[in-house]
Design a protein with these regions (language model features):
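Metallocofactor- and cofactor-centric catalytic cores in central/energy metabolism, strongly enriched
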Residues: 1-151, 155-298, 302-318
Length: 318
């Protein structure tokens, strides 16, 4: 099976060819939005982090933002920061350059003399980058180049018996063609983790699947919380789901039946192809964000009661 895509120099294949206007901190998000609104062919993302945070959270922010830039749906990147943030715009741009040969430029609002001057410079840079991106044509690519994130949200009683098994069948077909799929939301494995773990390609992967579920419950317990107080959600209950076990047993169907080749931390880049699992929160926005940062170029999203969740960089197919 073949499809038309944008072949990158690192061998990855995108289904879009965006120029990304990327804030390095919350303070620059609005400026990035203004720039993207003025240049056709660009996309921006909104973040509320990037400064005044602990080391682990700062590292997570850097991993997500770098992952967005490295995604095969992105041709090039215009980074904008404030100039005094923890995740510095120059450092972020340098990190992207070290990991990729995509065109990257960066601007600091304080250094350039304010948002208006920064936006003007960024618009000029983005227009030049879009012009270069327009010269790249789609080429015929193999199905083994597909990287599909699989998500569910707003689930109801039909999700586990209809849409999720249907998408699971799709996941198996992509696997058989040599492509890659990724499933996340660890809390929605709980109660069915023993079933999912049987798909582990090795005993180590089996144990990793069990461990991420146990770690999630322990993390909540340290704060005196239980995931069962938030799962199923009110939306799920109205739709007919009564317990976390019922929800999880339906949830894992969307990942298919093929062996799981790797378990990844949140927003990490995979080292293997095949069926992957990413350890993320059970929140659509976080999980889709993390999987796209991990490299997924398409998101297939099942929903029973409906949800508008999408993503700026990857098409989300409901």
């Amino acid at each position: 099976m073949k499809f038309l895509g944008f072949k990158r120099k690192d061998g990855s294949v995108g289904v879009r060819n965006h120029v990304l206007i990327l804030p390095s901190c919350a303070c620059a998000s609005e400026t990035c939005r203004v720039v993207a609104s003025q240049v056709l062919g660009t996309k921006n993302v909104i973040i509320n982090v990037g400064c005044s945070d602990v080391t682990a959270n700062t590292e997570m922010t850097q991993r997500v933002l770098t992952g967005f830039a490295l995604n095969a749906n992105v041709f090039g990147v215009v980074v904008i920061g404030l100039g005094c943030e923890t995740v510095g715009h120059k450092e972020l741009a340098d990190k992207i350059r070290k990991l990729s040969d995509k065109p990257v430029v960066s601007f600091g609002i304080q250094e350039e003399g304010g948002t208006i001057k920064t936006a003007a410079l960024a618009v000029e840079a983005a227009r030049k980058m879009v012009e270069e991106a327009s010269k790249q044509q789609k080429v015929e690519c193999d199905a083994s180049d597909l990287f599909v994130a699989i998500e569910c949200g707003g689930s109801d009683a039909t999700s586990g018996i209809a849409s999720n098994p249907a998408v699971g069948n799709m996941a198996d077909r992509i696997y058989d063609l040599g492509g890659t799929t990724m499933m996340s939301e660890t809390v929605e494995f709980i109660g069915a983790e023993h079933v999912l773990a049987k798909r582990g390609e090795t005993p180590e992967i089996h144990d990793q699947i069990i461990r991420i579920c146990e770690d999630y419950e322990k993390h909540l317990a340290l704060a005196g919380q239980d995931c069962r107080t938030g799962q199923p959600t009110p939306c799920n209950k109205v739709g007919g789901l009564s317990t976390i076990e019922e929800k999880s047993l339906g949830c894992i169907h969307k990942g298919g039946t093929r062996p799981v080749s790797e378990v990844l931390q949140e927003a990490a880049r995979p080292t293997k192809k095949g069926a992957l699992i990413m350890d993320t929160p059970g929140y659509d926005i976080s999980s889709v964000t993390s999987m796209v940062a991990g490299g997924a170029t398409i998101v297939v999203f099942t929903t029973g009661r409906g949800t508008p969740t999408g993503h700026a960089l990857a098409p989300v197919i409901k």
